Amino acid sequence: PDRLLHSMAQKTVSLVGEAVKRSPTAGIALVTQLTGEHGRQNFDRVTHTKTIESILSSLDEEGLQRYLAYLRDIIYAPTSAAPEDAKGIAMQRQSACDQMLGLVRSHLVQSSSGWVRDVLIFFAGHGYYAVKNPVKGPWSAILQVPTVPFTDALREVCRSRLQACLIELSEPDERGTPWSLAVMDMLDTMEKDHKHFTTTARPIAQERIQRAKSMLHQMRNASKKEKNETRKLHLRAFEILLASVILVTFEDGDDAPDMVDSVVDAAKLLFFDDKASQREMDGMELLTDALIGLLEISSAFLRSMTIQVFSAFSSSMTRDSLNHLVDQLGMGENEDAEDDEIKEDEEDDGDEEEEEEADD
């Protein structure tokens, strides 16, 4: 059947684009048929074409919103799997989440803050919080109580897909806010709404998150008042880093290392210490320690965000902080080891020459 799908897709893909441009509504109908109950959710991968992506690239904002609504319906009320088929439901739901992420990643699909925000709200509302009662207001169509309860595994999928989206979203939203900070605003709204949302974070994670949020709010207030452009850039970069740490900290268990302390301490020294000279020296070294610690954590998301911060602060790093970076990365040790090896080789060569002269 996969070969048949591939053959059919190859013959029709050249005709689909023009047809969808003439009638975007027909495009949505075609997508739902190709990826629905009688098709394949991973149609493009199975057929080795970009049929679905090509159709989606021809849709306007309204069409993309309808496509996302279709994917949410699959997640909230799976139809192609029986209620007792937990594995089938899980696969169907994860595939729909992957398609949402694919939409954000696609370079062919027209990006807009409207539908991108809806994707992030969905992943945030079900990954970092659980919807316990029907939501009212502008989020009511996006966040619903599922007919089959979400598993912890699906919530983990939502968290990882949201983080993957943020790696892709390098440009800010329509208000100029970095998307990671826009997600923080979403989570703050959910945290205050106890009637409809409950957090997925464990008590240890909640305590760490509150410490990080307190510093994040302090930094965002300072950023609004800051006049120096370089310092404002540094504040914004650090806000993004702190937001990223919060998103990963949501998953912390009792044995997880505390990522918050080192980042918060660095922020205090860099931005809120009264002694400017002390701030420059100690703050950059503490920042270096914090960033290296984050790079050691197995998280592609944190790695990506950490590298962004390195880039923002690179021009302001002092000689001491650069030397500290070399020490922390073990680069100096490697060079010393290489020097020792060279000296040993030279000494060995000298010994051999002396032995040869003695023999003569």
Predicted features and spans:
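Eukaryotic nuclear macromolecular-assembly scaffolds and interaction domains used across chromosome biology
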Residues: 1-339
